[in-house]
Design a protein with these regions (language model features):
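Thiamine diphosphate
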Residues: 1, 77-142, 186-198
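Conserved thiamine diphosphate
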Residues: 4-16, 20, 24-44, 58, ...
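Low-complexity, highly charged intrinsically disordered N-terminal segments
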Residues: 25-81
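Generic detector of short, locally flexible boundary/turn motifs and exposed helical patches
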Residues: 63-67, 92-95, 143-147, 170-174
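An acidic, phosphate/nucleotide-engaging active-site surface
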Residues: 69-76, 85-88, 167-176, 182
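Active-site regions of oxyanion-processing enzymes, predominantly non-cytosolic
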Residues: 205-207
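Active-site cavity-forming subdomains of large catalytic enzyme subunits
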Residues: 118-120, 124-158, 162-166, 173-178
Length: 207
């Protein structure tokens, strides 16, 4: 799924999407555990539920486990299990979702920095990718907090007199945020590796 937000509310919007689907998923997982604990649950259902719970934090492995669980839930629902019907109403939220928040440097370093900082500090398992052009690209090319010292832009011909804000170091200061800097054109393999590591990390990530 894809959703656009107001420019300055990007981080908060992404976090809200994550928390909303997480809440619905937690409700469904609680019901699955209740059904599996019942004496009426089949051995196949118990096995599918156990595999689903075991892999619930692994995006890659949880998707097939969720599909297998849904098949067992449908059998149980057809046999009259009301709780299975409740879970099936939320089946789109069973598989672990990967949440990515995309934005430019004008948003991340400046107008949306407060929201970005709040999201990273929350500890929630969301990923943020900042496309850093090192200037205000949307408004024609002015120097920004992302611009390097001495940088000349379209509307900053004299060069920037102060250094670049270190977004990576600010995020690293929390101690629990995965942080990587990539240059796709310079090292595609490292870029893919960093994205995979960010996805696998159970916590906030910033690339």
């Amino acid at each position: 799924a894809w959703s656009n937000s107001l420019f300055e509310d990007n981080a908060e919007h992404g976090l809200g999407m994550h928390i909303g689907q997480k809440y619905l998923r937690d409700q469904a997982i609680e019901l699955v555990e209740e059904i599996a604990a019942s004496d009426k649950a089949s051995a196949e259902f118990k096995a599918a539920a156990a595999k689903f719970i075991e892999t619930k934090d692994n995006t890659r492995e949880n998707s097939p486990a969720a599909e297998a669980l849904i098949a067992e839930l449908e059998k149980a629902a057809n046999a009259g299990c009301e709780k299975s019907k409740e879970v099936l109403a939320k089946k789109d939220y069973l598989a672990k979702k990967s949440v990515w928040i995309f934005g430019g440097d004008g948003w991340a370093y400046d107008i949306g920095f407060g929201g970005l900082d709040h999201v990273l500090a929350s500890g929630e398992n969301v990923n943020v990718m900042v496309f850093d052009t090192e200037m205000y690209s949307n408004t024609g090319g002015q120097a920004s907090k992302a611009s390097n010292i001495g940088e000349v832009c379209q509307f900053a011909a004299a060069g920037k007199e102060i250094g670049k804000k270190s977004l990576a170091e600010i995020a690293m200061s929390y101690g629990y945020v995965y942080v990587a800097q990539i240059a796709l054109g310079a090292n595609p393999a490292q870029a893919v590796k960093a994205i995979a590591e960010a996805e696998a990390y159970n916590g906030p990530s910033l690339i």
